[in-house]
């Protein structure tokens, strides 16, 4: 069905204020909820937070009073939208439960976007980040058992594999190396622009969640694990935002933000299986259609251009959630040794081709001098169970040692690194579900 967001009818802006009872709705059931309902809720929380952040920055840098007032009015509505979406999570869902949900978003969303990204360089960047978030899911899954005695599939529902990725201790870089070549706003498709904003919003929300909640556990190793992975999420935000053309005007950015909200809410509405939450996506889609129209009016007034030049006439689907096991496994086996080269080309290389003075070596050696928390995670689970918790096809599990041998940098290993030999010596754990 054709859906031109600028031509659709939404909720009039003067009808968008809601009561507190409507803003704070009943949360979903932690036990019964579909895992991808949870991922949609997590992502849309990030989408709304990015919209709120952007409009505050816009308001601080704009001297057009009419525009600043309208931005402030829309921002108030979007703040309440964020409240609604965030409050859909139940109080009985622990921080680690939610963390597994965040990493499921990161893995399955990034894989979806990579497969639906027309720009080869942007797709390569998505795949690069994918293998890092995949390893984060593996590390946090150990803590779900160590801290709360939980099976990670209570949250993941067997839709996303749990197995080693590119080792987290090797994710720490000179942040300048993370900067990527930006797209040309005059040549790049709306699909690429929306894809980047969608993933950027999710990664930014992940960083913020870990920064604001990781300290709330008492176990020092777990607290440090949150700190370590939070640092990587900062690098991911840096990496993805650098893909955006810095010459975009603030009005162009505003239109793109509103269009991204329309697309993501539309996608959530089309896919949602929970009827009560589907109503939330439908209502907020109708609100965002009007926000987009307002942004388009200001864009056309000030820049004398039609907003369709930016966003086209078709809706996009940037956040369809489904199992991505086969795609992720293929990227894992072929790209686990990939690294950012640190050259003016802002490209990629492999571990064996890194120069001795690669800037990220010093960063990794410094932060890992006393050990890497994410390596201690595996030491702790092995001390408890004799090996790590994994959930994947047995053939893939049997490749863990080989994957580590390919993906672990020999030059910057923390003193507590779990070695390839350690993985080779781990007993079979294909029946780990029997623990629960």
Model-predicted regions and their roles:
Residues 1-436:
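Non-heme di-metal
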């Amino acid at each position: 069905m054709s859906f031109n967001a600028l031509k659709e009818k939404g909720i009039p802006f003067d009808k968008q204020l809601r009561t507190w009872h409507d803003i704070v709705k009943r949360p979903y059931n932690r036990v019964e909820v579909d895992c991808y309902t949870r991922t949609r809720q997590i992502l849309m929380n990030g989408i709304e937070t990015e919209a709120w952040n952007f409009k505050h920055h816009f308001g601080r840098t704009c001297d057009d009073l009419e525009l600043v007032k309208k931005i402030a009015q829309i921002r108030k509505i979007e703040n309440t939208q964020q409240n609604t979406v965030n409050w859909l999570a139940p109080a009985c869902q622990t921080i680690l439960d939610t963390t597994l949900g965040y990493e499921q978003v990161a893995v399955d969303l990034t894989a979806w976007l990579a497969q639906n990204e027309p720009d080869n360089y942007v797709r390569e960047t998505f795949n690069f980040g994918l293998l890092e978030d995949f390893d984060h899911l593996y590390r946090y899954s150990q803590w779900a058992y160590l801290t709360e005695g939980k099976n990670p599939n209570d949250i993941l529902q067997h839709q996303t594999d749990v197995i080693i990725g590119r080792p987290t201790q090797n994710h720490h870089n000179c942040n300048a190396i993370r900067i990527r070549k930006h797209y040309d706003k005059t040549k790049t498709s709306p699909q690429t622009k929306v894809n980047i904003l969608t993933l950027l919003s999710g990664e930014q929300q992940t960083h913020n969640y870990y920064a604001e909640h990781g300290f709330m556990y008492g176990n020092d190793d777990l607290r440090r694990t949150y700190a370590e992975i939070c640092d990587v999420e900062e690098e991911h935000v840096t990496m993805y935002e650098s893909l955006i053309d810095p010459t975009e005007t603030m009005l162009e950015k505003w239109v793109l933000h509103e269009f991204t909200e329309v697309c993501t809410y539309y996608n959530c509405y089309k896919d949602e299986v929970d009827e009560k939450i589907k109503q939330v996506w439908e209502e907020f889609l109708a609100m965002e259609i009007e926000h987009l129209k307002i942004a388009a009016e200001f864009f056309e007034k000030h820049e004398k251009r039609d907003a369709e030049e930016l966003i086209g006439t078709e809706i996009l689907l940037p956040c369809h959630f489904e199992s991505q096991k086969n795609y992720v496994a293929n990227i894992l086996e072929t790209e686990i040794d990939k690294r950012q080269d640190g050259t003016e080309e802002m490209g990629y290389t492999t571990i064996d081709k890194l120069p001795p003075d690669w800037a990220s070596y010093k960063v990794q050696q410094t932060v890992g001098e006393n050990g890497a928390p994410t390596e201690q995670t595996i030491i702790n689970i092995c001390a408890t169970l004799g090996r790590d918790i994994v959930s994947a096809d047995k053939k893939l599990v049997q490749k863990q040692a080989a994957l580590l041998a390919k993906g672990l940098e020999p030059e910057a290993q923390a003193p507590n690194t779990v070695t390839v030999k350690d993985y080779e010596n781990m007993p079979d754990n294909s029946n780990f579900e029997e623990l629960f």
